[in-house]
């Protein structure tokens, strides 16, 4: 039964990932860009490249490419951290905030509407179960090592 339920959940999660990818593609980007933009948007005071790499399991090169590309578009800029000149915060310009908001905010609204289809009790149970599942899944994935 557990294996069957795990497979069913994986299918539902995959459908959610595919829906987000579809949404991103409609805006001319992919879900990795959308994920990075979401982190930047939700941290308007600035966020480091290292933090985004850690939270999205992305390489520095991937994040750096996204940031540099969107610096050229005038969406992002880098700000030196006063007490650590080597590290920089990624911040949005006014144009960037407007453009990124047009990507992130509709998705936030859709997620909130989908969540509101659940009762308060279902929401609480869903959040608790998802938190336990995510923490356990993370531990298992992060402990996995490929033999060389």
Region roles according to the model:
Residues 1-27:
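N-terminal leader segment of winged-helix/HTH proteins
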Residues 38-42, 104, 131:
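Short, locally clustered residues in the helix-turn-helix/winged-helix DNA-binding domain
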Residues 5, 12, 32-33, 48, ...:
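N-terminal positioning helix adjacent to the helix-turn-helix/winged-helix DNA-binding module
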Residues 16, 20, 74, 100-103, ...:
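Hydrophobic recognition helices of helix-based DNA-binding modules
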Residues 18-62:
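N-terminal helix-turn-helix DNA-binding core of bacterial DNA-binding proteins
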């Amino acid at each position: 039964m557990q294996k069957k339920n795990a497979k069913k959940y994986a299918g539902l999660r995959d459908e959610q990932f595919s829906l987000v990818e579809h949404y991103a593609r409609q805006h001319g980007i992919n879900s990795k860009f959308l994920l990075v933009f979401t982190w930047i948007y939700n941290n308007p005071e600035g966020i480091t490249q290292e933090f985004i790499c850690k939270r999205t399991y992305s390489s520095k090169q991937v994040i750096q490419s996204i940031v540099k590309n969107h610096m050229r578009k005038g969406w992002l800029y880098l700000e030196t951290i006063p007490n650590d000149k080597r590290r920089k915060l990624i911040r949005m310009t006014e144009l960037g905030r407007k453009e990124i908001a047009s990507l992130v905010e509709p998705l936030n609204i859709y997620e909130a509407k989908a969540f509101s289809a659940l009762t308060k009790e279902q929401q609480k149970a869903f959040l608790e179960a998802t938190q336990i599942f995510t923490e356990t899944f993370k531990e298992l994935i992060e402990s996995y090592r490929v033999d060389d």
